[in-house]
From Swiss-Prot:
It is an enzyme of class 4 (lyase). One of its GO terms (biological process) is amino acid biosynthetic process. This reaction introduces a second double bond into the aromatic ring system. FMN binds at residues 119-121, 213-214, 258, 273-277, 299. Gene3D superfamilies: Chorismate synthase AroC (3.60.150.10). NADP(+) binds at residues 39, 45. It comes from the Bacteria. This is Chorismate synthase. Its cofactor is FMNH2. Its EC number is 4.2.3.5.
Length: 350
């Protein structure tokens, strides 16, 4: 499968196109809308969330509620567009440190930074949540599920501290990042491959996780902690039980060994940096005058860690769904499930 997204933060709409979905997959619009709503929630979100009510509109690829095998096109309207479409917007010339503003303007020879920031905005992730929601619907057919949780915000591990830290950052014109954990359950042995570098499952997941705006680090299982421990305390012992097959008592590998899923839950943690749009802007240089100044302030969040958890679920769901289709094949959901059940029977008998 593959997908593309299009659209800008304050444009008319966001668009997503998915190619390669099997036919006869029930597209639950209510479920997709609930996932979009999840993305909009979280303490510390900005004023934009009071304007938008993200809802999916299916354009093509679905008939009588099920996919046909044709490309699936979806649209999410930007309600804030009506506030911008007839507005004379002055050019943005003061880039924000940590954002796409300056490198994007230089790369694409743009003297108005808005031509970069509109597409670079994390608003784009609404389209990816829609795509990931479709992937989740496909994985549900195979009894594979994802969940996420926020582990830290602003360095604090206890949830009762987060609200206080967010309020403090808001008063000081600052922003906060955090750490998110994603767990994927029900993944069978053998997704991904050791045979080529670009087929390794952890590499594919890391690539997609790192593509999410604001994510600066990723680890699996023990992650960086494994570097501080001897091998005898890191690697998961292998056991066997008749009628159940091979199993582990620990999951330090995070469900992936040698670039392949090993049957354990896949455990991923991602680090999100603080949002680079600050109410108390950092030092910058005006690209038009070359004079020292302060960066532009655009309406933004104090933190979006909870929202990012939903986005990370979506991109991970896409990877697992795509790998399932690569391995098991099937032009229809029925064919995919037959192939999948045959493989699971083989694994149990190995």
């Amino acid at each position: 499968m593959r997908y593309l997204t299009a659209g800008e933060s304050h444009g008319e709409a966001l668009i997503a196109i998915i190619e390669g979905l099997p036919s006869n997959l029930f597209i639950d619009a209510e479920f997709i809308n609930k996932e979009l709503e999840r993305r909009q929630k979280g303490y510390g979100r900005g004023g934009r969330m009071a304007i938008e009510k993200d809802e999916i509109h299916i354009i093509s690829g679905v008939r009588d509620g099920k996919t046909t095998g044709a490309p699936l096109a979806m649209e999410i309207k930007n309600r804030d567009y009506k506030n911008w479409k007839d507005k004379k917007v002055p050019p943005v010339t003061r880039p924000r440190p940590g954002h796409a503003d300056l490198p994007g303007s230089i790369k694409y020879n743009q003297r108005d930074i808005r031509n970069i920031l509109e597409r670079a905005s994390a608003r784009e992730t609404a389209a990816r949540v829609a795509v990931g929601s479709v992937a989740k619907l496909l994985l549900k057919e195979l009894n594979i599920s994802l969940k996420s949780r926020v582990l830290e915000i602003g360095g604090a591990k206890r949830e009762e501290k987060w609200k206080r830290l967010i309020e403090k950052a808001k008063k000081e014109g600052d922003t906060l990042g955090g750490i998110i954990e994603i767990v994927i359950e029900g993944v069978p042995v053998g997704l991904g491959s050791h045979a080529q570098w670009d087929r390794k499952l952890d590499a594919l997941l890391a690539y997609h996780v790192m593509s999410v705006q604001g994510i600066k680090g990723v680890e699996f299982g023990l992650g960086f902690e494994a570097a501080r421990l001897p091998g005898s305390l890191v690697h998961d012992d292998i056991y066997y039980k008749e009628n159940e097959g091979f199993y582990r008592k620990t999951n330090n590998a995070g469900g992936i060994e040698g670039g392949m899923s090993n049957g354990n839950p896949i455990v991923i943690r991602a680090a999100m940096k603080p949002i680079p749009t600050l109410l108390r802007p950092l030092d910058s240089v005006d690209i038009a005058t070359k004079e020292e100044t302060k960066a532009i302030y655009e309406r933004s969040d104090v933190t979006a860690v909870e929202a990012a958890a939903c986005v990370l679920e979506a991109v991970c769901a896409w990877v697992i769904a795509d790998e399932c289709l690569k391995k098991f094949g099937g032009d229809s959901v029925e064919e995919l499930k037959r192939n999948y059940d045959t493989y699971l029977a083989y694994v149990r008998s190995f």
